[in-house]
């Protein structure tokens, strides 16, 4: 029951996490800087909490790749939900099972099989339906935010496959690698942005407090979700985590006035179905 509660909590928070980042942007703090600070807070807490374990834990290049891929995943996701329509971005992110099937085949040697093929077909059909434009042209993401959401899902899938490959590392070690990776990727990406650093007037106590709070939430959320995944069957976990889309749809409607059209609902349903079938690809959740 505790594991299920953890996953439901994780789904709810991930479905709402876009909102404080939008609030921060409206206060004058861009997505790159806000992501940097919030994940730096999570990293700082993690280094203190797991310092003793980290000092004796084995190192490997795989942790570096996990850091890089997870770093882009989280930065791209934040930028996407700030700039774009929340549900369209999240559904493009939820094409991750499609990429997971392909990466697992390439990196882990897993057979695609009938279920894997069904996941691929449903994902592609859902994306094509949602992105179709009557005016013509290829069904591709319409703007930078949607491309960011798509790339975040792709990197999320790759980081998960890499995490499965790095099974000798603890949850704490992989979590710290993720927080470190996000911090570094934000610094590199932000270095090329003229407006990366907000003005001093934007960094009011309330703004700093909100960023610190989000950082604490990200730290706790990572551990809660990892615990839930470790103690819940894959089929059940994927269904619970899909509640994120429900929470996000409700929040986007009431907090941002965003609503999906019939074609987007149809495409989204196929993407959700692909995610549900993806839970049958493995008996044990990654991580």
Task: Please give the residue ranges for each predicted region.
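Specific alpha-helical transmembrane segments that line the substrate/conduction pathway
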Residues: 33-36, 40, 78-108, 234-253
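Specific transmembrane alpha-helical segments of multi-pass solute transporters/efflux pumps
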Residues: 13-16, 53-88, 129, 216-232
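Transmembrane alpha-helical segments that form core, pore/gating elements
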Residues: 7, 11-23, 46, 100-101, ...
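Helix-helix packing/entry segments at the starts of transmembrane helices
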Residues: 90-95, 163-182, 218-254
